[in-house]
Amino acid sequence: QKPKQVIKRINDYYLNSNANVHRGAHQLSAEATEEFENARLSIKNYIKAYSEKEIIFTRNATEAINIAAKSWGEKNLQENDEILLSIMEHHSNIVPWQIVAEKNKCKVKFAKITNDGILDIEDFKNKLNQRTKIVSLVHISNTLGCCNPIKEITQLAKNNGSLVLLDACQSLAHTEVDVKDLNIDFLAGSGHKLCGPTGIGFLWSREEILDKMPPLFGGGEMIQDVFEEKSTWADLPHKFEAGTPAIAEAIGLSEALKYINRLGLNNIQKYEKELTEYL
């Protein structure tokens, strides 16, 4: 179930501030836009991103990974390049890469896990090579419960010249995730794993990477100008957010992050440890 604060906040939006964002000149639209963009800022602060412009709202983490795979992957992956995953990945972090690999004629490789159910670092090292253009891994596995050594993995990847995408769905509500400290390049998160509503997620990447990525969806809001011959794109983050966004859901996610911050991640970890020891 969801925290009462989250439900109340969504209800308040629909009762008092219900309007589309970035489109209207009237007061309700201005209020909704402010609340929506404050939600983006709250995610930026939560993951310690460089700028709120780096936060792309999506329907879920699956869509976030698909945007990275299709927009960045199709543009940057060449024939015989490699994408390195682990065998513990969620299907959402496998299938998008398989699709782009088939289209761009590159390969998807999988690092093994040990008998203890953790990432086999030696196998990972063996499969990381000059053809590996991106490493995409889960932070905490939703099936095995293990926490991957992301800083060690990122260092290996960076030394190899590879980018790193982190599926942080399971970790964001349980441990601190600092994108700068982890030195990653992409992060995918989902609202419903953060005590927030369904139908909202986000993709983070550094501004210099996002600037070079083409938009995946076309329509309202993501354009700057539309001509008969061509169109030009809006600035970040809006060039990746076509159409009316999930406004209430974004505002609800922002309230959920406030709820987690009030509880404190250290207190959450302590309580989870006590539960584990009790079991």
What are these regions (language model features)?
Residues 1-279:
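Pyridoxal 5′-phosphate
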